[in-house]
A protein has these predicted regions:
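Short glycine-rich phosphate-binding loop at a beta-alpha junction
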Residues: 25-26, 84-93, 142-143
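Short loop/turn segments at strand-loop or loop-helix junctions that form parts
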Residues: 30-31, 53-59, 90-95
Length: 175
């Protein structure tokens, strides 16, 4: 087995076979310093509109958090999007083992985040539990992707139906 200085963790996140239409999805970007969230609404033609964008501090940066506190802060950060969609696309910028159901098991934190009890947890499942505790309607699906995969899929999606390329690259330079 070859070794590498880069984590190469497989993903089960593929581009959708067809563009979403007439629906909304909650989108989260949890990075090294910031936690961003918004609602993305697709019209009848599949064009996306971003609304209700908020940026807060990433939980666990200011002090060490327990697992419960970590996901509780996620739920608080998402309160402005409560019950506005039943699916979540989650760009989580930390190494995860992506599962076939779209969830991700956290392998470890990098950067400044301090929440050691979260390591080994299914991030999407824990988030669903925290949202339910805040009175959210049932979330049907949370799809986890790391930042590089998210960049790759976004680039492929932006190409649209009229521009197809032989390959795509997702590239994250610094944070």
């Amino acid at each position: 087995k070859e070794t590498s200085d880069q984590d190469m963790i497989r993903t089960f996140c593929n581009p959708p076979k067809k563009s979403a239409t007439n629906e909304s999805v909650i989108v989260i970007d949890a990075g090294g310093t910031n936690f961003r969230s918004c609602l993305v609404t697709f019209d009848a033609a599949g064009a996306a509109t971003i609304s209700e964008m908020e940026k807060t501090r990433m939980p666990g940066v200011e002090r060490e958090l327990s697992r419960k506190e970590f996901f509780e802060q996620f739920a608080v950060n998402l309160e402005h999007l409560k019950n506005k969609a039943d699916r979540i696309g989650f760009c989580f910028s930390y190494p995860m083992e992506i599962q076939k159901d779209g969830d991700g098991i956290l392998l470890g934190f990098s950067k400044e985040v301090k929440a050691p009890e979260v390591v080994g947890c299914k991030v999407g499942e824990c988030l669903k539990e925290a949202l339910a505790a805040h009175g959210w309607n049932t979330i049907k699906r949370i799809t986890m992707c790391n930042d590089t995969v998210s960049a790759l899929l976004a680039g492929a999606a932006c190409a649209g139906e009229t521009h197809r390329y032989s390959s795509y690259i997702g590239y994250i330079l610094g944070t």
